[in-house]
Amino acid sequence: MTAKDVKFGNDARVKMLAGVNVLADAVKVTLGPKGRNVILDKAFGAPTITKDGVSVAREIELEDKFENMGAQMVKEVASKANDAAGDGTTTATVLAQAIVSEGLKAVAAGMNPMDLKRGIDKAVNAVVEELKILSKPCETSKEIEQVGTISANADETVGKLIAQAMEKVGKEGVITVEDGSGLSDELDVVEGMQFDRGYLSPYFINKPEAATVELDNPFILLVDKKISNIRELLPVLEGVAKAGKPLLIIAEDVEGEALATLVVNTMRGIVKVAAVKAPGFGDRRKAMLQDIAILTAGTVISEEIGMELEKATLEDLGQAKRVVINKDNTTIIDGIGDEAQIKGRVAQIRQQIEEATSDYDKEKLQERVAKLAGGVAVIKVGAATEVEMKEKKDRVDDALHATRAAVEEGIVAGGGVALIRAATKVATTLKGDNEDQDVGIKLALRAMEAPLRQIVTNAGEEASVVASAVKNGEGNFGYNAGTEQYGDMIAMGILDPTKVTRSALQFAASIAGLMVTTECMVADLPKEEKADLTGGMGGMGGMGGMM
């Protein structure tokens, strides 16, 4: 076992704070409408330019082991905020830095770290409740556009694209972000259902340039079992060949002789077929097959209800206008299913969402609603260079997550104003159980000014003056760093999703609280390089003459 280096008390905390500051200072330059870029070196290819807090945080690794521990803890704050809300990573980092630095000062002044942490937790819980009261629902297309614009660093085109996409596919529809081919951004809306299963054999591909299978007006056979015997499929294949239409088979699996025969028939042009695995597993697969059946007016061939594949007829097959399959996804466009039945199915799944207990189940059910009720929107990001495209794609991704969060939990005034309003309200009523807890409450509430101060600093203004003016205001009154004007933040379209602000605060306080209560740090001692034993033998070369 390697020897350890152990630091205690103030020595440990000073090192930890140094690491926190290096990471947070690198991340916080990106905050706000006038935030700057950070360039990240890559082992291969061109450097990446980004304004995304979590992307910067992930790149930072410090040489000093103790400083690195502090940096990694704050990196965790950014990652957690990103996982929970998909945005707010820079805000979370700024909050964590503010709470840690204020907290460590209090510890150095002799306060009890555990009581400080309890005070911080009380303040954060009270502010989160206050944020919920301040929150208002985000419903109109204009509000969605404003949230997207703010999250994409004041890029209005991104906000507009996301608002259009949500309008087309509904708030629960599937929206993806891809690389575009031109200079401008584009929005493609795919009406239909997409699931994450690709073709079972590359020999089905009929569009080699795009490596996809495209079937026009196909029949769709839905089977809830593995197909390995071609004899079971023959009646359906003959019927489809007579009708002169292509066929898509969605089954638990197609293997062996059955798959080989389908491939041979396709290559010879006898019948145009493609096969994919059914999405999901177990009961979820059965439910998703039923969704596809309703969407395409087909029937799931299942032995559980006494149906056999050999006896299936063309009446049992679903139909759609078009099917596109690549190696990862299958998209069914314009199924001929009855509108009323589709709506009934959606209502049924929504009921299951209400009753679901686990978050995972809810998420999967939500996906099914999206696939049935909405469609698939693809935002294609255009840029002049690959470096610019990566940077822009990051911002569009952030904006997309932010708008989803806004639709989910509502919006509050942006620019750090909501935190200040909530903190001011809480400061008048919240009391701790002892003096040290009161100090914890005060320092946490003071730290909540940090995002506004940083936005103002990045805009080149005096943070204290602006923070004081905003604190003296009421309601949504705040400072628009983009135009350098004071006013009603919501009227100016500067909105933050409540979920993003809440998550940033909770994760920052959680990890900052742990760091404030740290008393000892342990790291491996650096290994000393052993001296090269051959180093002093250089003079031996002349011994050849002694023989």
Swiss-Prot record:
EC number: 5.6.1.7
Keyword tags: ATP-binding, Chaperone, Cytoplasm, Isomerase, Nucleotide-binding
Compartment annotation: Cytoplasm
Gene: groEL
PANTHER family (alphabetical): 60 KDA HEAT SHOCK PROTEIN, MITOCHONDRIAL
Enzymatic class: isomerase
Catalytic activity from the UniProt record: ATP + H2O + a folded polypeptide = ADP + phosphate + an unfolded polypeptide
Protein known as: Chaperonin GroEL
Phylogenetic placement of the source organism: Bacteria, Pseudomonadati, Pseudomonadota, Gammaproteobacteria, Pasteurellales
